[in-house]
Amino acid sequence: MENESSILELTKALIRRVSVTPEDAGCQELIGDMLRALGFTTEQFNAHGVHNLWAWRGLDPASSADIAPHLMFAGHTDVVPSGPPENWQSPPFEPTIRDGLLYGRGAADMKSSLAAMIYAVTAFVEENPDHPGTISFLITSDEEGEAIHGTRHAITQLAQRGIKPDFCVVGEPSSSHHLGDVVRCGRRGSLNGLVTIKGVQGHVAYPEMVTNPIHTAAPALDALAREIWDDGNAYYPPSSLQISNIQSGTGATNVVPGELKAWFNIRFNTEHSDAELRQRIEEIIHQHVLDATFVWQLSGPPFLTETGALTQAVQEAIRQETSLDAELSTSGGTSDGRFISPWDGSGQAKVEVVELGSINATIHKVDECVRVDDLEPLARIYRNIAESLLII
């Protein structure tokens, strides 16, 4: 590939667009123009201010399911806020190269991956203009935010047409110390909970007339924090619950509060369903507190791509480019892979999904950056994955 400068320039162009979630700021228009020039059919599934680009080339994915392989590249154009610009060494939305590093918000998460994917597919199509199967892109501007009207919404539209990829590479920054040293083959599930514990408000000098919800909640929350949920399994570490916020009291030192609210999150593996965890958590709380109510929000269930065609193609492509034996990992936070893997939610349409991208040491931080020398190798890895899966 001789596209290093082009990959760099595209990454810079994307960084310049201030696409703070859920804004796209023209990123998908730029990407769409490039894909259409390669013969891709493109369509927007926009909703509630969120931009979702769908593009495909090759066999019509609506009529070729189960006939020929379909490889989808997925990612997001939105970024998290930069924070105070004065805390950055250079303006966060003015791409700047220093000491071999490209700085800017979204450099690692994940505009460099998007640029590498585009140029990987450019090289692939130039070499294989009549390639078998289907190659596609699904790009959203709602991954860093609520993630309601982004990939999840687009998948609903595609599934209704009978479209489902066989394989998906998500360009999340998976690498730890060296490009390609870690590939995410799954992610833990994420379940958010809010428990409200009622008491009786009153004067602290009259304990017989009050019920202090802080006192009531303390042993319940302690039991929740001490609970051992599981021992993990071959793919996942043990599930972990963290209490993130507690709210109670009026601010006065002589008033017993009338209620306490506690927010918590559990990152869980495939040893549990979210329904099982909800029941277990409520039982633990109710062992100590009778008057407790719960509000639940499932960010996503766990997903796992076991060793198969996709993981083998990815590991071999990394090995060819870097000589590294990539670790298959399920660590880290949630991503849109949680929507792509189950696809239509029927349990019958699972997609093989991995996450592979830049080094993640600076994501969401001040002075986010990516190694310039990693851009071209990442594009070659993506291209080799496509060749392995589509050129049979």
Regions found by a protein language model. Give the residues of each.
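Midchain, well-structured core segments that form catalytic/ion-binding scaffolds
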Residues: L158-H288, A292-G300
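Histidine-centered divalent metal-coordination motifs
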Residues: H76, H203, H364
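Fold-level recognition of mixed alpha/beta catalytic cores in primary-metabolism enzymes, strongest
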Residues: L102, A108, S112-D222, D367-P377
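Acidic-glycine-rich active-site phosphate/pyrophosphate-binding loop
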Residues: S82-I97, V169, G186-T196, E316, ...
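Glycine/charged-rich beta-loop-alpha catalytic/anionic-binding loops adjacent to active sites
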Residues: P92-G104, K198-G199, R319-S323, N360-A361
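Acidic/His- and Gly-rich active-site-bordering loop/insert found
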Residues: M1-R105, V125-P132
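Zn-dependent metallopeptidase/amidohydrolase metal-coordination segment
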Residues: E43, T322-I392
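Short, low-order "capping/linker" segments at domain edges
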Residues: L304-I318
